[in-house]
């Protein structure tokens, strides 16, 4: 039988300003270990620590612009665009523009603080 997720789990985010993470499926909300799906709302000027995650992360930007820094430079991902970060690849996310950004992140396997491998 299909299972309705009536409301997400709100998770504390890393970064320089408060960012809202709403997990709809994943380790915290639904017990899924193979996938996580979360909506993020980050303010203008938010910067996350760099990371080298052990999971694939597919990010769909719904509003605003998400900058994704990587070893070879940076990508500006705008509303209606998506970016895929592969496991073992260093990335750093930030939202420098007015209004910040809203986006959905899908992680395979599910996001875990133990496998995100943030910069020290």
Task: Describe the residue ranges of each PLM region.
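A short, N-terminal "cap"/entry segment at the start of jelly-roll beta-barrel domains
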Residues: 1-34, 41, 49, 115-120
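Short acidic-glycine-tyrosine-enriched beta hairpin
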Residues: 72-88
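Structural motif
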Residues: 65-67, 74, 90, 100
